[in-house]
């Protein structure tokens, strides 16, 4: 696998306890907060410019940035070679405008330029679907909130 095969169009994270989904799609970060009240999802979506770094929970020395993140974390090959769902516990470091935060999340699907990957969830998500999410981030709720 060449390094460029690890480039992705989108990468999605979910924090169960704070009801947040983070999605880095193309060059934008989406922060989607959701809360279910009386069987109705209340959704707030922020679309922001920013950067994202990844850090494996079990290895605080691993810190990687944007497109090289999966490659440098050493899990890229495993993602490409497997079809079984795996969950990595991960911290994401966000730099949005002048704010910086660190969130504990599960790593959800990564959509690569070379095709569809099923990862961390039972649903497959394609490049076409990731483009739809970019246009309408509410679809993140449909895909990843039970």
Per-region residue spans from a language model:
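Amphipathic alpha-helical "stem/stalk" segments
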Residues: 1-146
């Amino acid at each position: 696998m060449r390094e460029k095969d690890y480039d992705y169009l989108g990468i999605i994270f979910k924090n169960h306890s704070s009801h947040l989904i983070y999605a880095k799609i193309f060059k934008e970060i989406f922060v989607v907060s959701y809360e279910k009240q009386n069987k109705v999802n209340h959704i707030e979506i922020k679309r922001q410019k920013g950067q994202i770094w990844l850090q494996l929970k079990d290895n605080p020395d691993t810190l990687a940035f944007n497109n090289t993140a999966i490659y440098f974390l050493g899990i890229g090959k495993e993602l490409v070679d497997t079809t079984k769902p795996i969950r990595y516990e991960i911290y994401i470091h966000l730099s949005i405008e002048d704010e910086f935060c660190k969130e504990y999340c599960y790593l959800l699907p990564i959509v690569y330029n070379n095709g569809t990957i099923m990862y961390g969830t039972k649903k497959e998500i394609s490049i076409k679907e990731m483009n739809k999410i970019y246009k309408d981030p509410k679809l993140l709720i449909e895909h990843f909130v039970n």
